[in-house]
Amino acid sequence: MTRQAGSSWLLRGLLLFALFASGVAPFNWDLPEPRSRASKIRVHPRGNLWATGHFMGKKSLEPPSLSLVGTAPPNTPRDQRLQLSHDLLRILLRKKALGMNFSGPAPPIQYRRLLEPLLQK
């Protein structure tokens, strides 16, 4: 009977040691390396600086494309109103050409006076 009690204590002790060892093992992987080995490694804290200044000051050799000329947004409120009225007229003329219904909301009165003579032509 004492032999079974002694072996159970031994088994419990081994099990406890195994659990303790498995819990401590992952922490040992993060220990720092000795200084002699770490000093041999060259560390660049900012990363690779190989092509840092390669494109600094470079100018484009191609002229700006003509499609970008004149696409700047209108600057003044008058220019914006003119652009909006042109866009609205173009949309309405497309709807008329496609035979679409004008069942949407009516344009504001200020634009209606501009559009009525153009649509009656």
Curated annotation (Swiss-Prot):
Q: What induces it?
A: Up-regulated in lung tissue in response to infection with influenza A virus.
Q: Where is it made, tissue-wise? A: In the hindbrain, expressed in the medulla surrounding the lateral half of the facial nucleus. Also expressed in the olfactory bulb and hippocampus. Detected in a subset of neurons distributed throughout the retrotrapezoid nucleus/parafacial respiratory group (RTN/pFRG). Within the RTN/pFRG, expressed in neuronal subpopulations distinct from those expressing Grp. Expressed in lung.
Write out the annotated subcellular location.
Answer: Secreted; Cell projection, Neuron projection
Mark the residues carrying the PTM Methionine amide: 56
**Signal sequence region:** 1-24
Return the InterPro entries for the record. Answer: Bombesin (IPR000874)
**Pro-peptide region(s):** 60-121
Cellular component per GO, a single term? extracellular space
Question: Which keywords does this chain's UniProt record carry?
Answer: Amidation, Cell projection, Cleavage on pair of basic residues, Immunity, Innate immunity, Secreted, Signal
What results from gene inactivation?
Answer: Significant reduction in the sneezing response to capsaicin at both low and high doses but does not affect pain-related nose wiping behavior or apnea induced by capsaicin. Abolishes the sneezing response to histamine, seratonin and the neuropeptide Npff. Abolishes sneezing response to mast cell-dependent allergy.
- What's one GO BP annotation on this UniProt entry? positive regulation of osteoclast proliferation
Q: What is its main location?
A: secreted
Which protein family is named in the record?
Belongs to the bombesin/neuromedin-B/ranatensin family.
Its function, per the record, reads:
Stimulates smooth muscle contraction. Induces sighing by acting directly on the pre-Botzinger complex, a cluster of several thousand neurons in the ventrolateral medulla responsible for inspiration during respiratory activity. Contributes to the induction of sneezing following exposure to chemical irritants or allergens which causes release of NMB by nasal sensory neurons and activation of NMBR-expressing neurons in the sneeze-evoking region of the brainstem. These in turn activate neurons of the caudal ventral respiratory group, giving rise to the sneeze reflex.
* Alphabetized PANTHER family for the sequence: GASTRIN-RELEASING PEPTIDE, NEUROMEDIN-B
UniProt protein name: Neuromedin-B
**Organism classification:** Eukaryota, Metazoa, Chordata, Craniata, Vertebrata
Q: Which gene encodes it?
A: Nmb
